[in-house]
């Protein structure tokens, strides 16, 4: 997400996290494997927190609120909604963050992307200056203006590296699909529905190497993101659904979203 958000906004977001003490937890040793199936429970479970704050800058048009998160038969729904007239931003959106950091390993999400001009839905890892680190980031970002594609990118040691907007071969807003990436010391490989989709090699590019925090969110692009996401009209409403998120370190055989559901 933060690869396309102005630096001042990035600092504001991270500053809020620092003020709430999350940064202290993030400095702990990276956590081990976990599997969160949102389609079989009605709560986030241990290890997650919901963002609930406003970023006071004209460059970012979305305030995070707990009220934009709900459970349905499909899993965890994150919504983008027009904010009330008295609100400080035009939109209310939703964001969920992992409390502890993760590092090298496999990351998976089963989700349905949000559709709509200027809408962004995502899964990514992030750390940055307010955690005492240079910015490192790995992303899957769905631009609601064309959900037959996905934006994959990474940030390493504070350097913005080239992103790719790639054809999926299907519409990611029509239903759930499995998205994954392997983050390893010498490469990052993105996957879609179990098939290799895109890769970058360490011999060709600088790669992120600092443990980060898993985040997923839905938000509205504005003039600052116009060339990338488009601008969301002020009456825009959109939803993304998340069924499952999992992580395991290299060499681990812990269960993942891609494994069959027991008894399913």
Where are the regions that the model predicts?
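Bacterial N-terminal signal peptides that target proteins for export
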Residues: 2-14
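A general, composition-driven signal for non-globular sequence regions
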Residues: 4-5, 21, 179
